[in-house]
Amino acid sequence: MKVSTLIIVSIPIVSGLQIKDTVGTTTENTFWYQLFGTPSRSQPAAVAATAAGTEVQGFTPISTSSSSSSSSAAPWYQGLFGVGRTTLGQVTTPSRTSTTTTTSNPIAPTTSIANSNNLFGTDTAPTTTTTTNARSRSRSTPVTVSGDNVLTLFGNPNLSTGNDQSNSVSKTTAETTTTSSAPSSSSRVQPTVINGGGSDGVLTLFGNSEALSNFDSTTVVDSDSTARITPIASASASSGSSTKDNDSDSSSARGIKSIPNSSEFLASLINGLGSGGGGNGSGSNTNSYKNHSTTSTTSKYFNSSSTATKLSSSKSIYSNSTTSRSSLSVSSSSTDGGGGANLFGSLLNSVAAVSRTLAAESTLSTGTTTTSDSANSNTKDYSSYSGTITSFPSTTGSLSGDGNKLIGGNKYLISFMWTNLILTMIMLFT
């Protein structure tokens, strides 16, 4: 009895699934959707991307790009149980936001003016030509401090502050080529100590072959490496390279002398290796560029070249960015006559030492990359919805087609189906 009654009652219920407004419409317009409420759907948001770039000579382009996408769909249960009453069957809603920002400060060109030495007393202003090319790039690499010109005991190491690939280092490279010319004038570029291996040399405890080179050059400054001087031409000798003084016709070397491999650092400190030919043999070279500065100090008594470079790194755990700053302090002394060419004489004659502090602290380039992914969820927050379904959708206008229409006499069919549902529930639980 119950089975037969169930079959009879279920016939109009099942047939109600086929009732549509018009023939060929989607299931959104079926009888059940109109009976319990039409669900709402939201289409996936379109992906938006913007990019802007401006390139000016001496400046680095600034680019910004962003993209976002989202998708959501309301379940049909929303219409069945009322808005905000269930989260069953919710479609997964992924969301992704990506923002990339790269900003670089303009790079000022470097100008080198030649020394004017006119024999007849009519000095002519020198001619200076400066060419600056700047480029910026951001990448995720460990922060590495070059070991060039570092005073160590046994060699020339490369010092690394870590191998954390999460460090985001913004690197800006500036290439500057300077050409100077003037009547009866000379242009002098401070040299770089070069050892026998061809790389930047260091003064070790147990001896190191060093040479002095002075020539026209192209200077390349890197934000996270020591300033280098790339030679164009040089004359080499057996124990190093021989350099001609630009200020005279003398062939004697000025500044750093070549230390043979048989000599040791301690011997040069105690005995001293005097410099022949003009001047006090002391010189200081400062290469300062934005947030990185390198200073080389030379002395004829110590036969050494020292570089003061300080690099500090600050990393943010949230924005994954790194800001590099550097500062340096330079102390130079002048020794004219007396005291002998040794360590003690140099100390006695360095009373008139000049101490200066140069600070170059500025954020050269900052790169920030932020990416967020929301976890896939099978639920949806309906807290923003309010109210319940209070009325059924109504049909307006004229309808055509062979399908049954939910107007006029069909309202009695709806009442009949509700009655059958109630009777079925009573029969099942009695």
UniProtKB/Swiss-Prot annotation:
GO BP, one annotated term: cell adhesion
Intracellular or extracellular location(s): Cell membrane
Upper lineage: Eukaryota, Fungi, Dikarya, Ascomycota, Saccharomycotina
Propeptide per record: which residue ranges? 402-430
Q: Which domain of life is it from?
A: Eukaryota
Summary of the function given for this chain in its UniProt record:
Putative adhesin which is involved in cell adhesion and virulence.
Name this polypeptide is given: Probable GPI-anchored adhesin-like protein PGA32
Q: One cellular component GO annotation, for this chain's record?
A: plasma membrane
